């Protein structure tokens, strides 16, 4: 792997990876699902790294892998945009409502998030993490009861290129892991910015290949 996280590698189908993850298998599994929903209104398509603990998917990748990925992404100079956001997020589980307040601008958004489909890839002995391809609908809500159950503070750094945002997020607040000594949750995810504009099968394949690239970064930092 070269020093920079060079996304031009994804144009070369002969690229030999340190991780033997089968991207073609991933593509074949999720392409029909993405094609079914990518033109839906308010659709969100994301890929999240994590670990399965029974049926629960824990998206906390830990500080060391998180930092390793961030350092490598920051070395790459070909990003179209790098965005930093700080958010206060309030959740209500009964109807999946969340209120997000941008700490820098004060802008507030209210949505209801409903899961459409999860495709899980777990127990992969040749990859450092499990991962989940998730399709959801995030519907804007104009008027909402502001009684919420949970609150989180999120700091996010987003690396954007070719219709994909690689998001590195730290969260503080309510957590699923009550035994964790670190109050911070470290999350790595990728979101297709505008699913409607996926041009062709090759572009989708290249987007999905980023999962393998992230795993390669983690493999080379062991």
What are these regions (language model features)?
Residues 5-222:
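Phosphate-end processing signature that detects enzymes handling 5′-triphosphorylated RNA
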